[in-house]
């Protein structure tokens, strides 16, 4: 081996293979390796003419093929497989070499691996990569976390292979430690909410407006302009328009209504609970997938549990436009919650996340790429310390203009017995967030009664407790 490959990729399933091809297509020599050597051979036979590849059959051969400091991208299944690769690589590497986990790892694992690698003199980076198989090959959104000096060693490669929007590569160093995988996790959580809002709109258009899949597909095609323009809206139109070759009807009508999930939405929701951030849209999207999985139970319940008698919409045109406005307002809330979560995590972990930069790199390559993100980028450019996107004048006005339609949609869905948890929880969050005084004062009173958890007063400093079971007097406890 000559040790002339600039970077290495181990793990040649579709994502790893496409990422390696993308790198090589940009003139960067790449060493490739897979746990099963046959796949490496197949890769070289299939794609060897796309760039300068060095196929290797062992990790030692793979490591020897790389220039120093060695830069190794690991593209294997999250969890124990990543730890296994690191364990095998560590004794083969030298101080200052770089391991880059570009899979969907949970950020606490990335924090742990960073420390473990550092103890052996190895630099570790957790890098979020979004865009699926096509993005990996043609240009993903890349969210690198870890040592900035390590990032400097691969910055030119990442900027070359990332998606480009308005001449700007969709990659930026996110922050230290687990920041990159954290941001990717929240990206995926927002993706859950985005998709749930879309399917709730589809459900309303089907069961309240009485439209079929092709007609709804055309509506989504129309919506894929202006503020709703996005990759997910675009492909929704395509999925709804697809004809099933077997039945001749819409393909979507013969797909089982049970949604899968890989866990990143759950991670996002659990993390938000730990931070104390209300993440209603994303969390309801996760719950909705869980409910969809209870297909056998739902079949039984559909013939047992009572519901309203549905009726056709009186004005279909007005309803369709109301749904469009409700979709946009709910989308604003979902993103506001996701960005608030990233802000809270950044403060807690001292990551110093540039939230405007996150919006910028999500504009291309990734699944949630959307015109809408330009508005978010601009919002953080003007207000870097923004608490909540809803407080930006543009979004404040946009939601205010949509709120009447939004409320009509939630009422109509309730009357018709159509579940829209993401729409309705987003509206509830909006109404709760805009209230100066909510009902949590009673919660504190109840907590103090049964658990002496104390409460604060609006007219005095300090913490107080009422002796409920004794003489009913109030005492200061701090």
Predicted features, each with a name:
Residues 30, 55, 124-125, 279, ...:
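Hydrophobic beta-strand scaffold residues
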Residues 7, 64, 82-85, 100, ...:
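Rossmann-fold dinucleotide-binding core
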Residues 35-36, 104-105, 129-130, 417:
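Short, ordered loop/turn segments at secondary-structure junctions
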Residues 54-61, 78-86:
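Glycine-rich, highly charged phosphate/nucleotide-binding loops
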Residues 1-70, 93-96, 133-136:
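NAD(P)+-binding Rossmann beta1-loop-alpha1 motif at the extreme N-terminus of oxidoreductases
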Residues 179, 192-415, 419-420:
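C-terminal substrate-binding/catalytic lobe of Rossmann-fold NAD(P)-dependent dehydrogenases
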Residues 400, 405-478:
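C-terminal amphipathic alpha-helical interaction region
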